[in-house]
Amino acid sequence: MTDSNPTRCGYVAIVGRPNVGKSTLLNHILGQKLAITSRKPQTTRHNMLGIKTEGDVQAIYVDTPGMHKANDKALNRYMNRNASAALKDVDVVIFVVDRTKWTDEDQLVLERVQYVTGPLIIAVNKTDRMEEKAELIPHLQWLQEQLPNAEVMPISAQQGHNLEALEAQIAKHLPENDHFFPEDQITDRSSRFLAAELVREKIMRQLGAELPYQITVEIEEFKQQGHVLHIHALILVERDGQKKIIIGDKGERIKRIGSEARKDMEVLFDSKVMLNLWVKVKGGWSDDERALRSLGYGDL
């Protein structure tokens, strides 16, 4: 007797401009926080896999940096190259757009995804915020005209609206394959990477308008000792002024950053965490390809 539900497994790229809700979408699909989020553009810098196994279906989501026009620094080039590379060798592409707003960077992404030959889904995000759903129809029709071969689906990444339907549509397009990852694995990234990203998220959320984008985080120690996980994180900035901003008056800001990051780490790693933060000035790191490679930014 044959199984009527074949085993399916494949890769799903989530692409779009910065700050459109890609990482929020991934987190909601996975049912837990994996990708960092903030209201600031370019929060995501690396491609990261989020793996969801449900019964016979394993969907391997590739969360990508937002495609953007700035290409002047090595870090910007790295992020754009990562996002474009995700369109290759995947089985499904999800193009996340806003319910009403359309920018030059959305157009940039559209020009890339129009060459996708496989299944393409346009996920129109934040539709829960519209009082009159009928107002959405012209935008959906316009998107369909731009990409006639795509499926257009209204969603809310934040509230989870219509995500079950989105996942069902994705599953239909995944090829028949054995699963590539164990059922309980949710990402390809190391615990060190996830810890560094959590610190960076708290920095972005704490700094607001003062945010210096030339910030990265390096984990210097990650060691379990008994029931306590000891993490030492180095925050790199490019100027002394940025260092002062992060530390804050009498060290209050860096204390808040550390406290918020530690809380999330304890949930993620299911352990008591002792987190120590330092801030160091490394001038020009975001435009230094050798420095970026040493900090884990891969090929540039």
From Swiss-Prot:
Region (G1): 16-23
Membrane topology: Peripheral membrane protein
Region (G4): 125-128
GO MF: GTP binding; GTPase activity; ribosomal small subunit binding; small ribosomal subunit rRNA binding
G5: annotated segments: 155-157
Positions annotated to bind GTP: 16-23, 63-67, 125-128
Positions of the Era-type G domain: 8-176
Keywords, alphabetical: Cell inner membrane, Cell membrane, Cytoplasm, GTP-binding, Membrane, Nucleotide-binding, Ribosome biogenesis, RNA-binding, rRNA-binding
Matches recorded under Pfam families: KH_2 (PF07650), MMR_HSR1 (PF01926)
Region span, G2: 42-46
Subcellular location: Cytoplasm; Cell inner membrane
Family to which the UniProt record says this protein belongs: Belongs to the TRAFAC class TrmE-Era-EngA-EngB-Septin-like GTPase superfamily. Era GTPase family.
Protein's UniProt name: GTPase Era
Organism field: Pseudomonas putida (strain ATCC 700007 / DSM 6899 / JCM 31910 / BCRC 17059 / LMG 24140 / F1)
